[in-house]
Amino acid sequence: METKYHEYDDVQTKDTPSNKYSLNENRGDLIFLIMEIIGESCNSIYDSFTLDAPQFAFRGIDKTLSKDGEIGKLITIIKNLIKEQSYLLKSPMTNNNNNNNNNNNNNNNNNNNNNNNNNNNNNNNNNNNNNNNNNSYNNNNINDNNNSSNNNNNNLEYNTKGGEYISSNQSSPLSIYSTPPNPSSYVSSPLNQPANNTEAFQINGNELDAAQIKIKQLELELQKFKEAGALFAMNKINNSSAPPPPPKACAPPPPPPPPPPITVVKQPSFLMKKGVNNNNNNNNNNNSSNTNDSNNTNNTKPQPTFNFADVLLNRPQLKRVSKDRSPGGTPAKEPKNKSGSVEDALLKAIVSKFKHANSSPVKSHDDSSDSDFE
């Protein structure tokens, strides 16, 4: 029986640049489309993935892909497909069938455990279940029962009218993307998937066509994405319940060294006045006979700077040395009769009496010159 494709499928089959965004070739585009769908159906996981852990949301996505153009068409197509199939996801028939199948399986398990005499009834029930599975496959419906997991969230049914896949879980239509009460129930690990790709794309030994393979690949990608989301939710719960790490014990940093002292270098001031103020000149002229006058207030006032002119004008008394100095700088010989004697007195008197004996009587003598010998 020829499969009838949806009217939107021509976007994937045209020979356009959109072929590189096909779902069975680029895993990054597939994850990107799933995140766009989750953004409308389950805001909690969408917010936590895009805000708290963007590395999960954008893993494997090529950063050069544009969010507009052909990738935008694919997003619109998947959104429209989910809206069109929402009535099938909410139909009570699917839920009733799932409930009946679950009840039959539970009854079979109870009969095997309690009554060994009902083996024939159990075999009949198992045969009926197998017949139902064969009939669903003949009607081009795919019921992929994942025996490694304990829930029915992995079951996908194939619709012959539009070529889409729908979820057969009993909860809300898009509850496959929601966070479960126990996140560890979803972490079944990707290792549970078949190791051989040919086994993953076969049902009862019959190979699937291209459209069915595409759906199977989409199912596997959804399973991986669901496990990654559950792992992130579980890690988030563990991190929130874990106590904060203790602060690292470390010694306080050593204090900074003190700044070096600021040394101010005072330059010596050799200020020499070119002249002396008029007050000093007048006082010096008036008191020329008494240079060391203590009543002169101008001279007794301390000068702020060293002035050579004041020193020269004041003519300080030099200290006399008791020893007579020779021109060479060596002390002269002391006189023998230092205190004086009678001979010296007589000699001095004779010299003073006869000093004018050889002088001319015409020549006048200056009294001032003789005063030195008197």
Swiss-Prot record:
Record region (Disordered): 1-20, 91-193, 236-374
Chain intervals with Basic and acidic residues compositional bias: 1-13
Biased composition (Pro residues): 242-262
Biased composition (Low complexity): 95-155, 277-300
Residue ranges, compositional bias (Polar residues): 166-193
Species of origin: Dictyostelium discoideum
Protein name, as recorded: Uncharacterized protein DDB_G0286379
Domain of life assignment: Eukaryota
